[in-house]
Amino acid sequence: MIYNLLFNYQFPFISSFAMFAAGRNYEQVRNSIGYPHLNVKIGATHAGISVGEDGATHQCLEDLALMREIPGMVVINPSDDVEARAAVHAAYDHVGPVYLRFGRLAVPVINDREDYKFEIGKGIVLREGKDVTI
């Protein structure tokens, strides 16, 4: 189905829990999307360890490592809903595979500045300092 969409000049946005999008489907993502550098976007929800009542079987940290090692795969882990919206638009505009990683729980908004602009591969300086680097 993905190939049918691509050959008709459309591209799929697919979504699943991170545990399944990256874990269970890793070989298919690597071989069928990553290696041929297809224009497919993967939205992975419930990433991390805060998945609520879904429990340990649905917790996923290794998705970052799995997706980052695929050549050409862009991995985006938005920090809040403002960045998540901007990241989806950036993924749409990017030609090639993208893995968008979303948590389950609500998080505080930190990207509410008027000059905020999301760019793939660039970080945001929230506050200058000398004591800690993150």
What is each model feature region?
Residues N4-G129, T133:
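Conserved thiamine diphosphate
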Residues M1:
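Glycine-rich oxoanion-binding loops at beta->alpha junctions
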